[in-house]
């Protein structure tokens, strides 16, 4: 493990662990507190690494990443990890976290020229409301030039191609990271 990067550890150890914990939780083999405890430990590590990365000034200034979860979405571990990966590559990030109303995101457009909004749709918006959410996001946030929305997560796996080129759907966090 000493020779593995944090990204390699997250992808090869933490991600499979979290999937297994989810299965154990759904089958009542463990309680929610067990899953929350492990998640909390991983979050602490990611926060610590992000704090260290933010001690240095960003080196890639061509865009700013705003990471958020949509209303009623609370599963932020994947988003925290994406924040780490983006910071690791020298970009400026603004991490907003859980349950952020779409309307509040347009405020950032006044301060930054090129924004990439990043989100993970794990449980919200649910499958039958994703397209409506994307249409609303397009009208409320992406109407101007220079901004994009990058999404990954379970709820967008069924979308093969979105009509707006400013909205990019990734099958996995690893695919999103490759685009950084």
Model-derived segments and spans:
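Long amphipathic alpha-helical segments
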Residues: 1-52
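C-terminal regulatory/effector modules of DNA-binding transcriptional regulators
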Residues: 31, 37-180
């Amino acid at each position: 493990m000493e020779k593995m990067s944090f990204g390699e550890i997250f992808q090869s150890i933490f991600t499979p662990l979290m999937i297994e914990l989810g299965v154990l939780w759904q089958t009542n083999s463990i309680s929610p507190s067990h899953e929350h405890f492990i998640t909390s430990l991983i979050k602490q590590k990611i926060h610590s690494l992000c704090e260290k990365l933010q001690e240095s000034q960003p080196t890639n200034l061509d865009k700013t990443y705003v990471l958020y979860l949509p209303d009623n979405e609370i599963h932020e571990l994947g988003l925290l990890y994406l924040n780490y990966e983006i910071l690791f590559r020298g970009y400026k990030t603004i991490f907003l976290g859980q349950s952020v109303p779409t309307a509040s995101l347009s405020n950032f457009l006044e301060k930054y020229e090129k924004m990439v909004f990043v989100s993970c749709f794990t449980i919200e918006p649910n499958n039958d409301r994703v397209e409506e959410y994307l249409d609303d996001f397009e009208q409320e946030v992406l109407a101007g030039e220079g901004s994009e929305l990058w999404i990954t997560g379970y709820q967008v796996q069924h979308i093969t191609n979105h009509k707006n080129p400013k909205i990019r759907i990734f099958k996995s966090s690893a695919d999103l990271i490759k685009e950084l």
